[in-house]
UniProtKB/Swiss-Prot annotation:
Signal sequence, renumbered to the chain: 1-28
Biotechnology usage: Vaccination of mice with a fragment (residues 275-398) protects them against a subsequent challenge with purified alpha-toxin.
Role description: Bacterial hemolysins are exotoxins that attack blood cell membranes and cause cell rupture. Constitutes an essential virulence factor in gas gangrene. Binds to eukaryotic membranes where it hydrolyzes both phosphatidylcholine and sphingomyelin. The diacylglycerol produced can activate both the arachidonic acid pathway, leading to modulation of the inflammatory response cascade and thrombosis, and protein kinase C, leading to activation of eukaryotic phospholipases and further membrane damage. Acts on human and mouse erythrocytes, but not on rabbit or horse erythrocytes.
Protein name stated in the entry: Phospholipase C
Gene that produces this protein: plc
Cellular location(s): Secreted
């Protein structure tokens, strides 16, 4: 929030130094706002690979949903590049990084970073946007669902690069931007058209084995990220040759395309079969995705909280306070809440609420537009609010 002025200024100074050291934005793979570039190539090829690899015994429902996805291909491409242009994004793209060995982005692992650490990572963003995509798909909102799926695949592509899973930023190395440019200029020669097998063979069948979506997604991403990180140290740093970089781009871009095909395959099976990733599972964390109204002065600098009450009468409440400015007019903010009781099921939670508390005597009102709560990879609450919340107030969302 804005009241965190000191560390916000530190973060701004870091952002300034980062931009000063790079001639372009700090992307992992390149992507243009119009849905072109390396990220768009990856998702386009991912769909093409899956189509080429479909075995004859794939269910008709999966084939039908693949056709719907293809009809919305431009939305997939737009979603795949959007996170690099999102006005709500962190200035240093902290949530586009994820070290598969530490489970952190560079805001926790890199010694030069002195501002508030960012809890979101490239890996957690994959799961969040995948959950939103499944939710909208199951409601028949295919265009929005495909855009969300594209966003998920953007982050998947990011953590497959050599630099992002190694938590090497443009502050750490000029190679970050140079390698991205190198790959973008040669991306056509790195396209692949198959994962090397049909969907009734091991690579694809293994993808469907673990019904726990969150656990599967994290470990699936980890495998590809580990390859990317390893390639950074063996072939993609500034000390390596152009031939090394060519090898690094070839391997990691092929992995991005193959991995994307596999992830989309899992998505299509989940929506085709109506799989519920939350059934019978304990809830260890809740993810809130809050949209603030675009109406003038809808944002707030007051303290904001999220709380729950379980059927046994116990309550838990968290402050919602991301580094930098959140709850701004038109913003979309994400918060992750760890539950004290890890034995809870989602049905054990009786009530949920958001609460506003004055920061000063002269409080400003706040107008949230919508809040979605995600548990175990499923949207469990979708609440349209569109009401002004004034003073010290509580708004029940469940």
């Amino acid at each position: 929030m804005k009241r965190k002025i000191c560390k916000a200024l530190i973060c701004a100074a870091l952002a300034t130094s980062l931009w000063a050291g790079a001639s372009t934005k700090v992307y992992a793979w390149d992507g243009k706002i119009d849905g072109t570039g390396t990220h768009a190539m990856i998702v386009t090829q991912g769909v093409s690979i899956l189509e080429n690899d479909l075995s004859k015994n794939e269910p008709e429902s999966v084939r039908k949903n693949l056709e719907i996805l293809k009809e919305n291909m431009h939305e997939l491409q737009l979603g795949s590049t959007y996170p690099d242009y999102d006005k709500n994004a962190y200035d240093l793209y902290q949530d586009h990084f994820w070290d598969p060995d530490t489970d952190n982005n560079f805001s926790k692992d890199n010694s030069w970073y002195l501002a508030y650490s960012i809890p979101d990572t490239g890996e957690s963003q994959i799961r969040k946007f995948s959950a939103l995509a499944r939710y909208e798909w199951q409601r028949g909102n295919y265009k929005q669902a495909t855009f969300y799926l594209g966003e998920a695949m953007h982050y998947f592509g990011d953590i497959d690069t050599p630099y992002h899973p190694a938590n090497v930023t443009a502050v750490d190395s000029a190679g970050h931007v140079k390698f991205e440019t190198f790959a973008e200029e040669r991306k056509e020669q790195y396209k692949i058209n198959t994962a090397g097998c049909k969907t009734n063979e091991a690579f694809y069948t293994d993808i469907l084995k673990n019904k726990d979506f969150n656990a599967w997604s994290k470990e699936y991403a980890r495998g590809f990220a580990k390859t990317g990180k390893s390639i950074y140290y063996s072939h993609a740093s500034m000390s390596h040759s152009w031939d090394d970089w060519d090898y690094a781009a070839k391997v990691t871009l092929a992995n991005s395309q193959k991995g994307t095909a596999g992830y989309i395959y899992r998505f299509l099976h989940d929506v085709s079969e109506g799989n519920d990733p939350s059934v019978g599972k304990n809830v260890k964390e809740l993810v809130a995705y809050i949209s603030t109204s675009g109406e003038k002065d809808a944002g707030t600098d007051d303290y904001m909280y999220f709380g729950i009450k379980t059927k046994d009468g116990k309550t838990q409440e968290w402050e919602m306070d991301n580094p930098g400015n959140d709850f701004m007019t038109g913003s979309k903010d994400t918060y992750t809440f760890k539950l004290k009781d890890e034995n809870l099921k989602i049905d054990d939670i009786q009530n949920m609420w958001i609460r506003k508390r004055k920061y000063t005597a002269f409080s400003d009102a706040y107008k949230p537009e919508n809040i979605k709560i995600i548990a175990n990879g499923k949207v469990v609450v979708d609440k349209d609010i569109n009401e002004w919340i004034s003073g010290n107030s509580t708004y029940n969302i469940k």
